[in-house]
UniProtKB/Swiss-Prot annotation, chain A:
Gene behind the chain: pyrB
EC number: 2.1.3.2
Catalytic activity: carbamoyl phosphate + L-aspartate = N-carbamoyl-L-aspartate + phosphate + H(+)
Role, per record: Catalyzes the condensation of carbamoyl phosphate and aspartate to form carbamoyl aspartate and inorganic phosphate, the committed step in the de novo pyrimidine nucleotide biosynthesis pathway.
Molecular function, one GO term: amino acid binding
InterPro entries: Asp/Orn_carbamoyltranf_P-bd, Asp/Orn_carbamoylTrfase, Asp/Orn_carbamoylTrfase_sf, Asp_carbamoyltransf, Asp_carbamoyltransf_Asp/Orn-bd
Record protein name field: Aspartate carbamoyltransferase catalytic subunit
Residues at which L-aspartate binds: K94, R179, R234
Keywords: Pyrimidine biosynthesis, Transferase
């Protein structure tokens, strides 16, 4: 291979596939650009013509409401033509291969693919395959990466905490199966966060996770001590079927974020969640709806961040 | 046909012979080394100056994809690839469609291979019907049809009671059982070594204990049943250590490793390179180094190509969904030479692991270069360099992690039973 998977030969962003290995300067540029778009999203319905005449294909091989919708809104605010394809019920079930599907859509003059797939590496595969003028944005691939989610999380943290270099961040929950956690860890590391913690039972941590540069905790009482940012993860119900956990009740008791546990963190700590939330499983409603929660602003920032990514890609 | 091979560097790994001399073949056998036998007239002379003349390669794992998987490869394409790679004998595992679990299928395969008259094909029969791990196959019938051993390939038996009975039954008749040690539940549909790389890439992982626990079970069952076992494609440092200890105890155990695992690690997966989706998974650097040590100290007896041609479509999928395996028949020789150079192993020692040792494991007479031996030979130019590419590979499978790599060592002639089948 040898070719960088997401940068072009000038070192600019060609695709957005992962936050791993993404230079800090590009990361900050995306956040700064997103900052300039927040006005647009708040001013409502004012469109910017940056993607006028461009076709953005939402290629979702896995069901999603929130991510797909925010991408769609972001593309429309940039004046792009958006085509939504729910691949979970489309040609894939008729036996067409992933790359055949991509070829057919490329022939319809796609300029950008937003890809969500349940297999790690799906977005890389597509990015390697498409013509050089097409851009690919990974909207979540298997357990591997969800870079725009991580970027909107970074945007949120920057809004509330300013300096990344003075933060203690804890990521709590099912790290093993989480593309969000992986992308958050790489983004936080690149932006200079000195201490990243992961808190989970051993069954929900991938092997050698400490090699990603995180401190491992199995206990919320110790793990939440003096933390500035709490990033909760969604717990899938199928983890009970696969012997990762005994029950949601026991999980909530030890790893669910309650007001008591939140009190262990710094008093000005913020609570984040990528959604959709399982209230009473990984997070107590009192915390989710409480004053330290920034979960709803996260969703709103998601639009600006996705506008930023799309406009930067279209300009490169 | 009388063939006179002139001036080649003759290497017989079995005896350690390594000298430049002439070789005389007649009636399919080696009749003289050095001096021309009385009345020997050259029907054909091969000038082998600067080349190495060694026994033809014996590959313990080469999938030919027949019957049933002809869209991936055919006997024609793969046996042509074999002789182009200097491979004169190969064992083909039973993971065809249907699996080699009844005598008719084996006879058909043998018959087809005989008609093509290329490399010698030694089918390995399925240990259980349909490779399902429940009912035993008719091993005696399969043996009579031509199976040299019995195996589950990549479908390990989950029920240890069944495995014990299968080993007992095979041992009754003195049949060898070939097993790749992997616990099916611990492997849990994983596709990569459990470690930092799988963690970064978010790939379902297979822990080392999937190999060592299965290995410990097999070793205990060997003691229980008296079966002799050949371990296929070991992948880990800990597994190698278990094999070393078991051999010291005197268990009738042999072991091979795939040439891919001798060179590569999980880091080679890079950004989801599906050509590195192999079974067992490529493991860590420490595992690979331990495999090399095991190969050098004799813990691991042989290197196989683990040849698995896969069609382009089946590889053009996200990593976990892509079909596992790599084409290897034409790479076994140059990659073994590369390994020998990197580990400062002499040529006779290195070649032993792809000729003499695997021939002993298969229980066949080839794999040596001696007077009276069958003239299955590989004549190669050790200094000829070539780049692995779609066009260079004769195998129908172009899938290999080594695409684009420059390798040294190219087969010039391959002889089977004293007949030139390549060159």
């Amino acid at each position: 291979m040898g070719v960088h998977p997401q940068l072009n030969k000038n070192g600019e962003l060609q695709h957005l596939l992962t936050t791993e290995g993404l230079p800090a300067v590009i990361l900050r540029h995306i956040l700064d650009t997103a900052e300039s778009f927040t006005g647009v999203t708040e001013r409502d319905v004012k469109k910017i013509p940056l993607l006028r005449g461009k076709s953005v294909f939402n290629l979702f091989f896995e069901p999603s409401t929130r991510t797909r919708t925010t991408f769609e809104i972001a593309a429309k605010r940039l004046s792009a033509d958006v085509i939504n394809l729910n691949m979970a019920v489309s040609s894939q079930t008729k036996g067409e291969t992933l790359l055949d599907t991509v070829d057919n859509l490329s022939a319809m003059h796609a300029d950008m693919f937003i890809v969500r797939h349940n297999q790690s590496g799906a977005a890389h595969l597509i990015a390697r395959h498409v013509r050089p003028e097409i851009h690919v944005i990974n909207a979540g691939d298997g357990w591997h990466a969800h870079p725009t989610q991580a970027l909107l999380d970074m945007f949120t943290i920057r809004r509330y905490k300013q300096d990344f270099h003075a933060l203690r961040v804890a990521i709590i929950g099912d790290i093993l199966h989480s593309r969000v956690a992986r992308s958050q860890i790489h983004a936080l590391t690149t932006l200079g966060v000195p201490e990243i913690r992961v808190i989970a039972p051993k069954t929900l941590l991938p092997a050698k996770v400490e090699r990603l540069g995180v401190h491992v905790y199995h206990n919320m009482v110790q793990g939440l001590q003096d933390v500035d940012v709490l990033m909760m993860l969604r717990l899938q119900h199928e983890r009970m079927e696969s012997a990762h956990l005994p029950s949601t009740e026991e999980y909530f008791k030890y790893y669910g974020l309650t007001p008591e546990k939140l009190a262990l963190a710094r008093s000005d700590a913020i609570v984040m969640h990528p959604g959709p939330m399982n209230r009473g499983v990984e997070i107590d409603s009192e915390v989710a709806d409480g004053t330290q929660s920034v979960i709803l602003p996260q969703v709103n920032f998601g639009i600006a961040v996705r506008m930023a990514v799309m406009s930067i890609l279209a300009g490169n | 046909m009388h063939i006179h091979i002139r001036n080649g560097r003759l290497i017989d790994p079995g005896s350690g012979m390594d000298r430049t001399d002439d070789l005389y073949l007649a009636e399919g056998k080696i009749v003289s080394i050095g001096s021309r036998p009385d009345g020997f007239h050259d029907d054909r002379e091969i000038e082998a100056g600067g080349m190495i003349v060694c026994p033809g390669l014996v590959d313990l794992s080469a999938r030919l994809r027949e019957p049933g998987l002809e869209y991936m490869a055919t006997l024609e394409s793969e046996l042509e690839a074999a002789v182009a790679g200097g491979v004169t004998s190969l064992a083909c595992p039973p993971d065809t469609d249907p699996p080699l679990d009844e005598p008719g299928l084996v006879e058909m395969l043998k018959h087809r291979a005989r008609n093509l008259d290329q490399a010698r094909v030694y089918p390995v029969g399925a240990l259980t019907q349909g490779l399902k791990g429940a009912r035993l196959t008719e091993m005696v019938e399969l043996h009579d049809a031509g199976c040299v051993a019995f195996s589950q390939v990549d479908a390990p038996i989950a029920n240890l009671h069944v495995l014990m009975r299968a080993m007992q039954y095979a041992a009754t008749f003195g049949f060898k059982v070939w097993l790749r040690p992997q616990d099916i539940h611990l492997a849990n549909h994983g596709v990569a070594h459990e470690g930092e790389i799988a963690t970064r890439l978010g790939l379902p992982a297979i822990p080392v204990c999937a190999e060592t626990i299965a290995l410990a079970s097999i070793l205990s069952l060997m003691k229980e049943t008296g079966a002799s076992v050949h371990l296929c494609r070991i992948s880990s440092a800990e597994g190698t250590a278990l094999v070393r200890a078991a051999k010291r105890q005197g268990l009738p155990l042999t072991c091979d490793v795939s040439i891919n695992h001798v060179h590569l690690t999980d880091m080679d997966i890079g950004f989801f390179d599906a050509n590195c989706h192999l079974m067992p998974p490529l493991r860590s650097l420490a595992d690979r180094d331990a495999l090399c040590v095991g190969l050098m100290d004799g813990t691991i007896d042989a290197i196989c190509s683990d040849h698995a041609p896969v069609d382009e479509d089946a590889k053009s999928l996200p990593f976990a969904q892509a079909e596992s395996g790599a084409t290897g028949l034409e790479l076994l020789l140059p990659l073994t030479l590369k390994w020998a150079v990197e580990n400062r192993l002499s040529l006779p020692e290195a070649l032993a692991r792809i000729t003499f040792h695997p021939a002993r494991i298969l229980g066949i007479e080839t794999g040596q270069l001696a007077i009276g031996a069958v003239a299955d030979l590989c004549i190669f130019d050790p200094d000829a360099n070539w780049v692995v590419s779609h066009t260079e590979l004769r195998s129908q499978g172009k899938n290999t992690p080594f695409l684009g790599m420059e390798l040294y060592g190219r087969t010039r002639f391959t002889l089977i039973g004293g007949r030139i089948v390549y060159g």
